[in-house]
Amino acid sequence: MVREITVDENYQTVRLFNEMKKGDIYKVPYDKKRHNGIKLEASRRNRDLRLIGTLKNKMDVKYRVSATEYPGFSAIICLK
C-alpha cells in the first residue's frame, strides 16, 4: 500500500516504522536532514533484526529507503 505522509507536529519517524507491514511504501516529503534520519532508523532496525536472527546475512534487509524512486519524496519500503 502506497501512503503519502504529511509532516506536521505529530510526525515521528519511529512511529512510521512501527506501523509498517509487509509491502507498505510510505512517501515522506524530501528534506536532506529528515532523509538521513530515516536512513539511520532503517539501518538500526535492519541491524537489530540481524542480531535477533530474523534476517540472515548482511545483504538481507527488511527496510529500504529511496530518494530516487518517487522524486520529491523519501520512500520507506518494507520488504518483509
Residues of each region from the PLM?
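C-terminal edge-of-domain segments
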Residues: 57-80
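Hydrophobic beta-strand residues in large extracellular and virion-surface proteins
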Residues: 26-28, 38, 42, 63, ...
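A short, charged, amphipathic alpha-helix used as a generic interaction element across diverse proteins
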Residues: 33-53
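An N-terminal amphipathic alpha-helical segment
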Residues: 1-35
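Intrinsically disordered, low-complexity peptide-like regions
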Residues: 22, 44, 55-58
